[in-house]
Structure formats: structure tokens, C-alpha cells
Amino acid sequence: MALQSESTGPVSPSVDPAEIAKFSRLSAEWWDPTGKMAPLHRINPLRISFIRDAACRKFERNAKSLSCLSGLRMLDIGCGAGLLCEPFTRLGAQVIGIDPSATNIAAAKLHADKSHLAIDYRCTTVEEIDPRERFDIVMAMEVIEHVNDVPAFLGRCAALMKPTGIMLVATLNRNWKSFALAIVGAEYVMRWLPRGTHQWDKFVTPDELEQHLQGLGLVVTEQSGLVFNPLADRWRLSPDMDVNYMVVAETAP
């Protein structure tokens, strides 16, 4: 049975209550592209295109179609205030967004209502989702570096995939470069993120992530790094996975 916190919602084994509280404090900032969540707004177009294109390749859809994800069930784990849920709803997906922070879910619902979008937002954790529910696309974007038990968390994510589904994971590599750029640079020098947003020892290397996924009977089919160009002031997809990276996984043949 999940523990209940008035301010942060349900807590389960893989959830770190301190991480929930941290992002709850940012709930009012989620949709401000120049505020504390500006880094996510900057990187969001790349995340959206990567996920959309991976899904369209898997399900043989035309990525240029404005309804290319029509009929697909999508689960966004750790959805925050819906920065991914809204664009994928507009592309036709049936989106369920979950987050253990009640304040984040409230912010997400408010923004979706203002945008006239029907999104199923739930203040819950992946462990609390009915195991009979299945999804074509399961997303855990910038989440696993904030959970307590990565293997258990990924196991629950995998259990919610349809046999023909895909899982997308975005996280941060663990090395000296990610410490220098994602923590010292982003939190202390550039001040893109509040200090303490990330804990370097919770970062996950691509090899570790792939081993976890293989242990669940999944195979990585696509992967990409995300690299920031300070001269152009923009992010781009790159083979360089030293800091930020994303992977796509599906059931092994």
C-alpha cells in the first residue's frame, strides 16, 4: 500500500520523497519558457521529434502527418506539468500522464484545460498503475536519475508495455564530463537549474541502462545523445552520449 503525503501524493519503493518535494516546489514554473524550467523548454523540441520519429518508425506511421500517433496509447511517467503530454495529444495519441507530485498534476490539469486538451493526468506512481493496463509507448524522460531503485522502476515500466510496444528513456551519463557540465555548469555557473536538482551518483551510464533493459528481455534499438552548442545557443541530437542521452527499447525478438 502506498504511503500518502498531503503535499507530494503517493510514495512507492522506487520514489524518492525528497525528489518529489523538489519538483513540487517548481510546479508553478513549469510552463514559463524563461523561468527555472527553461532548460526543459529548450530541449523539448528535440525530445518530441525523437520520440515521434521513433514511434512512427516502429508503428509504420507518416511522421509528417498531424495525427501520426492516432490510436496509440502513451504513458508519460514523471510527466511534471505535461510538457510532453500536450504535444503528443495534439498528434493524436491517447496520453496518460502520471506524477507523484500532486502540485505538478494540478498544474498539468490546469494548463491542459486552458489548452482544451483531454489528457488523463493521475497523481500516482508507476507501481500503482493497474498491471492490466498496457501501452504502445512508455516514456520515462529525465526520471530514472531521480528514483531510488532503477532496476525495479524499469521493471514496472516494462510490465506496462504491450508486446509490440516501445519504451523510451532519457537520462544523464555518469562521468567527469556530466559532473562538470550537468551539475557544476548547469546548476552553479550558468544557473540554468536550481542547485541540488541532480545528484551525480544517481546518474546512469548507457551500458548500465542497457544491461538493466536486457535483464527485462528488452533490446535497445535506437539511441542518441543531446548536445548543447553554446555559440548557437541550441541543442542538437548527436552520437555523443557523454552527458544527456536517450534510448528506445523494445521486446527482444
Curated annotation (Swiss-Prot):
Alphabetized NCBIfam families for the sequence: UbiG
Transmembrane domains' residue ranges: none
Keyword vocabulary terms for this entry: Methyltransferase, S-adenosyl-L-methionine, Transferase, Ubiquinone biosynthesis
Highest taxon, organism lineage: Bacteria
Protein name: Ubiquinone biosynthesis O-methyltransferase
Enzyme Commission code(s) on record: 2.1.1.222, 2.1.1.64
Organism, as annotated: Rhodopseudomonas palustris (strain BisB5)
Entries under InterPro entries matching the protein: SAM-dependent_MTases_sf (IPR029063), UbiG_MeTrfase (IPR010233)
